[in-house]
Amino acid sequence: MHTGKFSRWVFEAIHRGNHGLFIQILDMKLRVSCNLRFHIVEASALILMLRPFRGIQQWINRDVYTIKPAIPMIESTDSFGNSCQRLVAPVGDFLIHTSAEVMVPDKVDVTPRAYFVEIQHLPNEVLTFLLPSRYCESDRFGDLAREITFDSLPGYDQVSKINDWVRNSIQYLPGSSEFPLSAVEVHHLGHGVCRDLAQVAIALCRSISIPARLVVGYLHNLQPMDLHAWFEAYIGDRWYTFDPTQSVLRGGRVIIAFGRDAEDVSIFHQFGSGCLLNNMDVRVDLLDNSPIVIL
C-alpha cells in the first residue's frame, strides 16, 4: 500500500465498496490539454468545468490552468464533486488553456455477473441518478428497455445489452449536433454525437431502475480528437464504465465531470449573448509511466 501523497486515494478506495476491497491499477500516464479561444463582445459571466476530476478513478500529477488576459477567477465544487471555475470575461479575445498529467487505468473493468442493486440498498448519493432528468426522459423508455433486456440477467448483463443496442441502433456521427438533444429526440432521429448516445443509454438504464450517470472527459486515441462523453451504471455496489460509441470498451479515459445529463457536465455555461467560442483544440498524448496500484 502506498503511503504519503497516495494515502488519501488509498483511503477512498478501501471505503468505496460495500463488499470487500476494491483495487484500482493506474497504469497509463496521459497528458491532456484543452485550449479555448473566445471573442467577447460584451463582458460576460462564465462558469467553466475544465479541471480533471479528483478521485480514486485517476491520479493527477500536474494541473495547469491559464487565462489571458489574467483576471480573477473563483474556484468551487458542485454537488457532484466536479471542479468549477467562475469568472467575468472582458471584451476582446479571451483565451483559456488547461492541461494535466494524469495516471488512469489502461483497461476498463468488465464484470458480467455484477448484480442488480435493489433500490432500498442504494447509497443515498446514487438515488438522484435513478430519476428522469432534462435530457434523459427515463419515464419514456420503460417498454423499450424491457424489450432489449428481456433475456438478460439483472445487473451488468442488462446494461451491456442496452449499450450494444444503442451502438447498433443509433448512428454515431461526431460533430453532427452543436446543442444538446434529449434522449427521446435522439431516439427519433436515429443518430447523434457521443453525448447523445450516452444519454439514450442512461434513459434506458434508469427506466429499469439501474442508476446511470453521464461522464465527460478525454479518451486516448479518439478519432476525431475532441472531448468525449460516455456513461456509468451503478451495479454490484460500484460504478462501471460503458461507451456505446466504441465497439471495444477501452481505458485511457481522463474524467472531467459526472452528472445526471449534459446540463450538469457542460464544460462552460455563458450568461448573456456577448460570448462567442471561435476555436477549441483538444490533445491527448501518451507519456512514459510506472503503474500505480491503489488498494
Task: Spell out what each predicted region is.
Residues 164, 196-278:
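Hydrophobic/aromatic-rich core segments of domains that either
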Residues 22-108:
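Intrinsically disordered, low-complexity N-terminal segments that are enriched in acidic
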Residues 71-73, 119-122, 249-258:
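Short, surface-exposed linear segments at secondary-structure transitions and domain or protein termini
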Residues 40, 96, 102-106, 112, ...:
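Secondary-structure boundary elements
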Residues 51-53, 112-120, 245-249, 271-273:
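Short intrinsically disordered coil segments
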Residues 15-18:
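N-terminal polybasic/positive-inside topogenic patches
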